[in-house]
């Protein structure tokens, strides 16, 4: 169809008290309000049972109560259950290097549960003029490598966007592809006053089972003294990136936003000896107070809407190549958590004012107005770490794994296409299709037959045959 996938702290983190799992949600009431509501409902049901005991079998009220209970049971049956999707995110400044031979540990391919959605953000992909032109004609080596790795496991590349060295890739389990819709990409340059794309942000937005999500991969200004500029650049990216959909015209209109990349924030004030001593002893908490991003989040209201898991892994910059040794060159760059993954749940228009304790927050509930939260979504961070085994770059890759707990707003494909009988090259083939009743059809709609290049994990390439959509049965 014309709308195919081709169109395409004091708050450093929040813990739910179970290990390092970090939770935020879009439920429309606090936990205490929910408990009060359930208690009131139980009381009303108890009163109703007492009334039922007093009713006679021929009482008119008996029939009315029975009808009311039947409607209540039907309403409960229509509420779709919560389901959990596994999101695996990677951010990695690859410093123009070619991909390593094996990315199994980076993608947690040998662990359970399996991932539903991969979102991979790279920075400093080789963008030398000849290399960049060749990547435009073919596929860049990183995209090709990830596709070759994930395709045999039935992942499909849903979308990608590149701006010079910035690359963002989205892969999905095949089963979810019909429910990933309204895919759009965009980018913003911030390098050289917005005229050069070596710095900036690239974004992919889409609807996942009806929930609007946006992923923003950024590479911000470098060096210790440019923390304010980094904040300004990110705010500029948020303000300038727009999309075609009326209900989500900007990044912050989406129900869930993930902000990640080489954000380039440093650890201020501390000397090299104190930094390395704290890192070697695993006392990372001694460095949090001087982490520039955590400091800026205390000052900037728009950054306070974002959450991040605790930084309980070694700073990921800067390393000697193919080693676990921090920079020994003449520059001797100080170690820093430059590579980060944060997320934001769309808040209500009037967020409640809450006093927040210093340090890592213990609870956090963000509220969303979307559909009055008939279909809430929760973001539960399971893992936030780096993988030190990769040495092709002076950065170590950072991994964030999330459980997306959601009630699906849509669980029916827009279009169902069913081949009838056995298809063979020397026989007529018949395919039938059905569309949802509220599907907005057009005379420009069409059905295309594609070669599925599973070896590259993407549906596309040469269109073998195209048919206009005019009837419900095509021959």
Model regions and ranges:
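Catalytic lobes of large eukaryotic enzymes
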Residues: 148-153, 216-221, 225-475
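Internal catalytic domains of large membrane-associated glycosyltransferases
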Residues: 104, 138, 142-143, 147, ...
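A Trp-anchored, charged/polar loop motif used as the substrate-binding/catalytic surface
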Residues: 98-106, 191-205, 235-249, 260
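Amphipathic alpha-helical protein-protein interaction segments
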Residues: 62, 78-80, 85, 92-96, ...
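Active-site-proximal beta-strand elements of phosphoester/diester hydrolases
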Residues: 86-95, 171, 183-185, 211-225
């Amino acid at each position: 169809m014309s709308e195919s996938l081709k169109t395409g702290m004091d708050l450093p983190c929040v813990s739910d008290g179970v290990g390092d799992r970090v939770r935020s949600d879009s439920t429309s009431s606090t936990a205490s309000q929910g408990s009060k509501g359930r208690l009131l409902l139980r009381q009303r049901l108890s009163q109703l049972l007492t009334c039922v005991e007093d009713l006679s079998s021929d009482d008119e009220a008996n029939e009315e109560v029975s009808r009311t209970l039947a409607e209540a049971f039907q309403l409960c049956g229509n509420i779709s259950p919560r389901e959990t999707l596994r999101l695996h995110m990677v951010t990695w400044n690859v410093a123009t290097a070619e991909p390593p031979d094996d990315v199994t540990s980076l993608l947690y391919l040998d662990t359970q549960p399996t991932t539903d959605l991969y979102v991979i953000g790279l920075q400093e992909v080789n963008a030398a003029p000849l290399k960049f032109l060749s990547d435009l004609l073919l596929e860049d080596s990183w995209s090709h490598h990830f596709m070759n790795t994930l395709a045999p496991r039935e992942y499909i590349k849903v979308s990608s966007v590149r701006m010079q060295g910035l690359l963002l890739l989205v892969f999905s389990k095949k089963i979810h592809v019909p429910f990933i819709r309204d895919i759009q990409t965009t980018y913003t340059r911030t390098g050289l006053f917005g005229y050069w794309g070596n710095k900036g942000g690239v974004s992919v937005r889409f609807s996942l089972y009806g929930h609007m999500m946006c992923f923003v991969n950024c590479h911000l200004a470098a060096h210790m003294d440019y923390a304010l500029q980094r904040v300004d650049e990110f705010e500029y990216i948020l303000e300038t990136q727009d999309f075609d959909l009326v209900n989500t015209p900007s990044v912050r209109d989406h129900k869930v936003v993930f902000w990640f990349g080489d954000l380039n924030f440093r650890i201020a004030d501390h000397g090299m000896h104190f930094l390395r001593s704290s890192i070697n002893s695993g006392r990372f908490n001694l460095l949090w107070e001087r982490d520039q991003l955590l400091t800026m989040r205390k000052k900037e209201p728009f950054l306070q809407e974002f959450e991040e898991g605790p930084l309980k892994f070694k700073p990921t910059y800067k390393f000697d190549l193919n080693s676990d040794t921090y920079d020994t060159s003449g520059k001797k760059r100080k170690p820093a958590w430059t590579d980060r993954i944060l997320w934001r749940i769309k808040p209500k228009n009037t967020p409640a004012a809450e006093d927040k304790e210093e340090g890592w927050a213990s609870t956090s509930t963000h509220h969303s107005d979307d559909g009055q939260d008939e279909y809430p979504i929760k973001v539960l961070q399971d893992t936030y770490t780096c993988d030190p085994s990769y040495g092709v770059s002076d950065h170590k890759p950072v991994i964030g794994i999330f459980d997306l707990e959601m009630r699906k707003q849509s669980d029916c494909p827009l279009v169902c296409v069913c081949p009838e009988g056995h298809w063979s090259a020397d026989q007529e083939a018949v395919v039938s299709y059905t569309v949802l009743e509220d599907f907005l059809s057009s005379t420009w709609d069409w059905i295309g037959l594609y070669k599925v290049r599973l070896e590259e994990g993407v549906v596309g390439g040469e269109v073998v045959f195209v048919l206009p959509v005019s009837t419900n049965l095509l021959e």
